[in-house]
Structure formats: structure tokens, C-alpha cells
Design a protein with these regions (language model features):
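GHKL/Histidine-kinase-like ATPase module
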Residues: 116, 145, 160, 173-178
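A short amphipathic beta-strand at an alpha->beta junction
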Residues: 159-170
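GHKL (Bergerat-fold) ATPase N-terminal catalytic module, capturing the glycine-rich phosphate-binding loop
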Residues: 2-136, 140-141, 149, 156, ...
Length: 178
């Protein structure tokens, strides 16, 4: 939400020209991944270093160990909400490109340890994709009904809509996905 506000502010003062993007959640069963995507302001390599690495790795491991059996206790802790992803994912990737004209796209990869990689990549559009590679013992989070339930529980009051799944409608006497 704060990143959306920043994008709105940048647009209002003429520093950003473009459309505000969609927030989507996509499950890919064959790869056991959940991808959360937006067309927001994105991140630079420096911002990933500052906001993802420095904040999260300063105490995140101890915090996650303390609350590993109570995911609800993590919600709202600055810098640690993102790292709760490692409670269900064996690896997380962030593929992102900042709104800045001179920005290079980057991919950050981490397995939950303090070790990570960051590399420049090609990405046409601004925004971010966060890809969770779901642990074998957490496959329930790949089920459409479970993801839907969690999105409704934790995201229904967000000021931006989240697209997930396919819409079902009746056509020619049967239900189809669109």
C-alpha cells in the first residue's frame, strides 16, 4: 500500500508517467510456485540491498525461529513480513525493475539463509514478481481454495484489488472458466 501511495505521489508531481499496475497472484502447480506480481514502482539493486537484505537479515532468523509455529504473530513486524515467506518456501526470488528511466532490472534469490544472490537481468516492464518455491511439506498452499481463503482473510481490506484464479460463469448451459 505504501509503495502504491509513493507511485501516486510520483505521478502527481510528474516524476512518473505511466499506468498504475495490477496486483496478481498466480499458482503454477508444475513448478510448485506461487508468484505475486505488481506493476508498481519496482526496486533498484540498491533498494533491495537496503530494504530486503539489511533489515531482514538483522535478526530475522531469530524472529522466524521464535514464531515458526505461529505465522499470525509475524504479521505487522516491519521488514519481517516478507521473510515469513520462508515458512512455506524453500527459495524465494524477486524479479524487479524500478520505475526510474535509468534503472536496470535485477533478480534476487535466497533460500532463507543469510546467503543470497543478486544479478542484473532483462525485464521489459517496471514492477516486481515475487516467486515462492513452495516446500514439499507445505503443498497445501498451492491449492486454489487455500490461496483464496488466505487472500480473503488477510487482504480483503487492502485499498488495491488482488486478481487470483479464473472467473467462473455459465455459458451454453455449463460452467466455464474465463
Amino acid at each position: 500500500y505504501k509503495r502504491q501511495q509513493k507511485l501516486n505521489t510520483l505521478a502527481s508531481i510528474g516524476e512518473f508517467k505511466g499506468e498504475l499496475g495490477d496486483l496478481t497472484v498466480h499458482v503454477e502447480l508444475g513448478k510448485d510456485t506461487i508468484t505475486i506480481s505488481d506493476r508498481g514502482i519496482g526496486l533498484t539493486a540498491e533498494e533491495i540491498e537496503k530494504y530486503i537484505n539489511q533489515i531482514a537479515f538483522s535478526g530475522a532468523n531469530d524472529f522466524l525461529e521464535k514464531y515458526k509455529n505461529d505465522a499470525n504473530a509475524i504479521i505487522g513486524h516491519f521488514g519481517l513480513g516478507f521473510y515469513s515467506a520462508f515458512m512455506v518456501a524453500k527459495k524465494v526470488e524477486i524479479i524487479t525493475k524500478s520505475y526510474r528511466d535509468d534503472a536496470k532490472a535485477v533478480k534476487w534469490t535466497c533460500d532463507g539463509s543469510p546467503e543470497f544472490t543478486i544479478e542484473e537481468i532483462e525485464k521489459a516492464d517496471r514492477g516486481s514478481d515475487i516467486i515462492l518455491y513452495i516446500d514439499d511439506d507445505c503443498k497445501e498452499f498451492l491449492e486454489e481454495a487455500r490461496v483464496s481463503e488466505l487472500l480473503k482473510k488477510y487482504c480483503s481490506f487492502l485499498p488495491v484489488p488482488i486478481a487470483f484464479g479464473k472467473k467462473k460463469e455459465w455459458k451454453d448451459g455449463k460452467q466455464i472458466e474465463t
